[in-house]
Amino acid sequence: MKNVVITGTSRGIGYELVQLYGAKNYNVICLTRDLSTIPNSKNISVVSTDLSSPESIKNAVDFINDKFSSVDILINNAGQLINKPFNKTSFTDFESVYKVNVFGVAELIRLLLKSFNSPAHIINISSIGGIVGSGKFSGLSAYSSSKGALNILTEMLYEEFKESDIIINTLALGAVQTEMLNNAFPGYKAPLSAKEMAEFILEFSLNGFKFFNGKIIPVSISNP
């Protein structure tokens, strides 16, 4: 039975992932700021975590290590999005986005390094907008650039981990019908639901490490 850690589980793709792993009776720890949407159960534990806070991340890792003997799968799904014109996007806006989308991811991985199983699969959830040469959208300068940084972080960590059994990949998602998408593009209808994308991520987490390592993989049939 695998031990899975997922961030950003209160809604959207993260929420659906918890349901899918739970249905397989995997042990799941959810790191989220909103504890109201997923109750604790026999194999699912929910930990209040602010990924912009190193102290909160450390507390979450302590909980993980108390609960799990090792971690098989880590899915860094949590994301912060601000949709503002660049000339109205403040230093604080950029900082808040990067803290969750980049710094928090790096710190969580760093603190879990001794806890990963052999092999372990880390999956960073990014955006197609963070890939060089992809279509870009006005108002997402902080979000898309942070996802670009996350993509490079994945490639750098591959270089550092490649002699180990830690596999790391990034899935750069296109349009998925979530609250985050609706906030960025009100009224836009995405071709995929959160559950459909979660099903793909689940399968990739279990088998993708056999075929990919250190890769930024576009997962998109549409990009608003």
Predicted regions and their residues:
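N-terminal Rossmann NAD(P)H-binding glycine-rich loop of SDR-like oxidoreductase domains
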Residues: 10, 18
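Conserved NAD(P)H cofactor-binding loop of Rossmann-fold oxidoreductase domains
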Residues: 77-83
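Alpha-helical segment proximal to the catalytic Tyr-Lys
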Residues: 114, 155-160
